[in-house]
Amino acid sequence: MRILVTGGAGYIGSHTCVELLNAGYDVVVVDNLYNASEKALERVEEITGKKVVFYNADIRDKEAMNDIFDKEKVDAVIHFAGLKAVGESVVKPIEYYENNIAGTLNLCDAMRNHGVKNIIFSSSATVYGDPAFIPITEECPKGTCTNPYGWTKWMLEQILTDLHTSDPEWNVILLRYFNPIGAHKSGMIGEDPKGIPNNLLPYVAQVAIGKLECLGVFGDDYDTPDGTGVRYYIHVVDLAVGHVKALKKLEEKPEVRVYNLGTGHGYSVLDVVHAFEKACGHEVKYQIKPRRAGDIAMCYCDPTKAKEELGWEAQYGIEEMCQDSWRWQSQNPDGYATEK
């Protein structure tokens, strides 16, 4: 099978390309490199010993997308491309709706024009908003999103569901998850955020390597074991494998399927800090700060459905997530700008 991966040069996309190539799939990547590096794909090829077909293109470019589908006879699409920073989405809602919604509509139009009706969508557990219950199952009410990023994911899930309703040949899988962390065991590919990291682990890693001075921990008075917020994290390689497992599910009768991908339990902010200290061998400085508005005490998912229907289960715990992140960060202190 030939798989088109949008956003395939990004953090999750590049790791998914490795797993796809290792599983014997042919891979075509479309990425505008806004928050990614072509070097990631060069390293994907080095890791796997296989070639990736790469197009530096924006999914919002209708002509470019139709040209790519003309040239590459793909069987399915794994869709990662889009803006993804929660905080930035609050400041730049128009950019997020235009990029994520319009871009995906354009992608789906090109797919329809070329008879490609298999899509795995990289959604997010942000669609659950402040969850009605924990652990979160796929039946947890959604649509109470707290930021424009979450709303784009919610809207795109609805759009893809409507596509299947209008044409039952559309085969759609929606994968929901939070907080991918870690890196490939080789240390050759990993998360390379531009500027100050938005997410916890890249920030911790940059404090550990000395690029940033101190981690701010927002709140230590939550109703959790150590008072800091509890979230669920997933190793990016586990997440990539989940997307490959989902491809096999697309071979069954077309419908809309939804799966949570996670470890099934959460880790507090200080759990992550202490695990990273163990991985890097020295202290990670942090400072307790006031709670942030909108933050919730605890959030993690129940991945039972993915285990039962996809045969997928997370293999890595927080220790390995931190070890692999540290290997990537220490070998590549400036990300893909680091000369190898």
PLM segments and residue spans:
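Short-chain dehydrogenase/reductase
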Residues: 97, 146-154, 190-198, 202, ...
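N-terminal Rossmann-like NAD(P)+-binding domain of SDR-like oxidoreductases, especially those catalyzing
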Residues: 1-183
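Catalytic core of nucleotidyl cyclases, primarily class III adenylyl/guanylyl cyclases
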Residues: 186-188
